[in-house]
Amino acid sequence: IDELDPARLQAAIVEQPAPQARAAQLCVASSLHALKALSEEIADRTKAIKFALTGSVGKTGTKDMLYQMLTAFGPTHATKGNYNNHIGTPLTLTQMPVDTQFLVCELGMSHAGEIADLSAIVKPTIAAITCIADSHIGHFDCLQQIADAKAELFSNFTAGGTAILPRDDAFFAHLKTAAKTAGASRIVSFGMHPESSFRLTEAQ
């Protein structure tokens, strides 16, 4: 941070002080833990409607579509690229403008427990799962374990949250139960299934 312009940098979170730095420094034991704590505080304070989404495929495309749609209704902030891990998610929150009305966070995982940790940071108002597939099966023994890990998304729902689920997925009932158990007040589904809340009937 010695070379950073103090006019653009008001303070830096550091683990080791830089004696020649011209900007203020906040010395902490773990910069990663400090980043997480800061992002959690921002998530708690914001009045934005918070969307969190995960799934085996389609996360980034769905996030980008949501961003485009929500921007028409108010200031919207979303995960950049696929910065969807334990560093990218806190950064998404710390970079969120104060006037944001809609926050869209893409959450990724490679191990069980990761989605729960990220969900605890965001505390989503609306949580969506695109689908359950074997895209990340390298660290899991079966699709059921992947479904369980993705369902961690609901573990930190804002009270009365909404869950959006893939109706055609073999694990729909499992995900629905997980969402209801977590306190979802509304379940919305999508897909080709005739009982889907929303389904594509015609395309051009």
Place the predicted regions along the sequence by residue:
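A short helix-to-beta-strand connector/capping loop
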Residues: A21-A24, A182-R186
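Phosphate-binding loop of NTP-binding sites
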Residues: H33-R167, A173-A184
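Short, polar loop motifs at secondary-structure junctions
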Residues: A12-Q20, R167-A170, M192-H193
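Adenine nucleotide phosphate-binding catalytic loops in nucleotide-utilizing enzymes
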Residues: L143-A147, T177, A184-Q204
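Structural signal for conserved beta-strand scaffold positions within catalytic alpha/beta enzyme cores
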Residues: V14, C27-V28, A52, A78, ...
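Short low-complexity, flexible loop/linker segments enriched in glycine and/or proline
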Residues: R22-V28, T92-Q95, Q204
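N-terminal leader/targeting and accessory segments in enzymes
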Residues: I1-A37
